[in-house]
């Protein structure tokens, strides 16, 4: 399966990220580039290059935009996803992350582990929603979907 070799964030329409959000973005991009699978499905009306691809993520008009370019830099796909299906899971994810960061400072390991398990469960739900929303637009594995969901969370935070 093909993969992503470059990921960028177009946040020109968003408020400037906080230093913490900027750091989360950098970590999410690094993790995604370390290991991912990304393929465009075949279409009758166009040839689909095998990749590798570059991806720019943006939020425009309250929609998540995937702008995909091929190895030569030419756009090979652009698709828009409604943010609606992500809103609650992103909100839940940020709330549980805040609880986790607070817990690390003052709770025993057993309670931290319980919060972390809940965080992973919400993260998995977000990845599943993303897989469903990408159906017919891009083919990714569950690990790539998880990493993309993390990036969507930090992008969505500024929207």
UniProtKB/Swiss-Prot annotation:
InterPro entries: UCP032146 (IPR008321). This is UPF0262 protein Dshi_0980. It comes from the Bacteria. It holds the Pfam family UPF0262. Transmembrane segments: none annotated. Belongs to the UPF0262 family. HAMAP family: UPF0262 (MF_00678). It comes from Dinoroseobacter shibae (strain DSM 16493 / NCIMB 14021 / DFL 12).
């Amino acid at each position: 399966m093909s993969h992503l070799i470059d990921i960028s964030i177009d946040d020109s329409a968003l408020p400037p990220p906080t230093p913490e959000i900027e750091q989360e973005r950098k970590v999410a991009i690094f993790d995604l580039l370390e290991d991912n699978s990304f393929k465009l499905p075949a279409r009758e009306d166009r040839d689909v290059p095998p990749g590798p691809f570059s991806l720019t993520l943006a939020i425009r008009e309250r929609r998540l935009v995937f702008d995909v370019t091929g190895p030569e830099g030419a756009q090979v796909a652009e698709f828009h996803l409604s943010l609606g299906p992500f809103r609650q899971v992103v909100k839940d994810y940020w709330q549980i992350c805040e609880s986790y960061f607070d817990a690390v400072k003052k709770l025993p390991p057993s309670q931290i582990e319980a919060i972390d398990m809940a965080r992973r469960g919400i993260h998995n739900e977000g990845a599943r929603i993303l897989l469903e929303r990408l159906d017919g637009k891009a083919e990714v594995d569950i690990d790539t979907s998880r990493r993309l969901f993390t990036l969507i969370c930090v992008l969505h935070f500024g929207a």
